[in-house]
């Protein structure tokens, strides 16, 4: 399944990709809090230094899996990412509110988030989704659909990662 391109060169999220994302999100949505935490624990397993980017984790003695602030943040990020993916084709673009994108861009810039951080997060997201779905639901096409949706969300955040003029 190839990604279609619009006349302006933008990548179009196709019907098949949308169907895969919607089907898998329907399975995962009811367990979003747990999956969000697993997603972040994977990020920290791959890149332990990423914990230092979160003020609420820096001086905390609470184990990550029990940290209420991490649980809340992780669920929020996971749900926003998945909902943005689910709306991508219908809206034709990332549907996170512009004010939210600006805030995300500014926050990611302030904490020095770089391409490598987005790559680790993308890998952790795909692994979390793969583990959350029944084995017969996960496929290369499913992986590509989620990877494309994540890529478009990251591109939207990066567009807002600019220093104040």
From Swiss-Prot:
It is found in: Cytoplasm; Nucleus. In vegetative but not in embryonic organs. One of its GO terms (molecular function) is metal ion binding. The record marks 143 as: Homodimerization. Disulfide bonds: none annotated. A motif (Homodimerization) lies at residues 45-49, 115-127. It catalyses: Fe(III)-heme b-[protein] + nitric oxide + H2O = Fe(II)-heme b-[protein] + nitrite + 2 H(+). Pfam families: Globin (PF00042). Residues 12-162 form the Globin domain. InterPro entries: Globin, Globin-like_sf, Globin/Proto, Leghaemoglobin-like, Leghaemoglobin_Fe_BS. Heme b binds at residues 55, 69, 73, 103, 107-108. This is Anaerobic nitrite reductase GLB1. The lineage of its organism: Eukaryota, Viridiplantae, Streptophyta, Embryophyta, Tracheophyta. The gene is HB.
């Amino acid at each position: 399944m190839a990604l279609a391109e619009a006349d302006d060169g933008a990548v179009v999220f196709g019907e098949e990709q949308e169907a895969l994302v919607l089907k898998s999100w329907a399975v995962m949505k009811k367990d979003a809090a747990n999956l969000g935490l697993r997603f972040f624990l994977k990020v920290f397993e791959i890149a332990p230094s990423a914990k230092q980017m979160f003020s609420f984790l820096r001086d905390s003695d609470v184990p990550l899996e029990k940290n209420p602030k991490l649980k809340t943040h992780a669920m929020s990020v996971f749900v926003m990412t998945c909902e943005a993916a689910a709306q991508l084709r219908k809206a034709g673009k990332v549907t996170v509110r512009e004010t939210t994108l600006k805030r995300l861009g500014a926050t990611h810039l302030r904490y020095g988030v770089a391409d490598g951080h987005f790559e680790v997060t993308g890998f952790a997201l795909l692994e979390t989704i793969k583990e959350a779905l029944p084995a017969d639901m996960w496929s290369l096409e499913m992986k590509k659909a989620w990877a494309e949706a994540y890529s478009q969300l990251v591109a939207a955040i990066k567009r807002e990662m600019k220093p104040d003029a």
